[in-house]
Amino acid sequence: MRKRVARKPNEALESVLEEAEQNLLAAFAKSQKTKHRGLKGNARAKSIADFLTARLPAAYGVATGAEVVDYADRRSGEIDIVIFDKQRNPVVSADPLWIAAETLLAYIEVKTKLTVGELNKSFIGAKQINALRPFKRPFTLAGQPDAGATDNEQLRCFRTVFAFGTNLGCKGWLDNEWSRIKKAAVFASVTPASIDRVLVLNRGMLNPPSQTGTDQFAVSSVFQQWVFNLVNFLARENGRRPAWDWQLYAKSKIPGWRAL
């Protein structure tokens, strides 16, 4: 058996992500100085969206304050940040900002402080995503494949709750946060796997589909781990996701054609 060799950290990449994390915290602190709640939320979402826009490949669109709509006019409600393939898929509408469910690859809900109420709202939002029918079929949740579809037909959407803090104390935080995540899922009548990651920037990260979590900052920044998770997911999912067909959203009756 070969002895495993510890991998040398990539200092260049780590320094970029560490700087980005500090910039997010600085943007959060700056937003605290405004008394307008809407402006606070917009500033925090924009700081994350700007980071992703600058570092994701140009093919990806990163938008804030968007709503996702499917062929039957089911809608998600406004989402803080959405990520989609803008190279192959145009937006449905720029004002208001609508994107087709078929183009949605990931979304992020940004929270100032994670509380029971905010978790409840996040899982209700996830339930609205579950109700969408991209390509006339549901999104597949992590760890819960659709038995009636092939691997290439499974449609995934990476869902994140990104919080700058939590109202829970440090002692036993990971277990306590997981406990109320499960309760929030029950509140919304969905499975905890309806959200892929719950990231608390100053505390740790939970992976509800695998029922695991970490608060070990000394090993690696949870922000870095989240970025890696997101980027790897986008590369896998977008590589097999078909392009959106406008015809899916056309009127049920279209003009007939005849030979000339």
Show where each model-derived region lies.
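Intrinsically disordered, low-complexity Ser/Thr/Pro/Gly-rich regulatory segments
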Residues: M1-E78, I83-L260
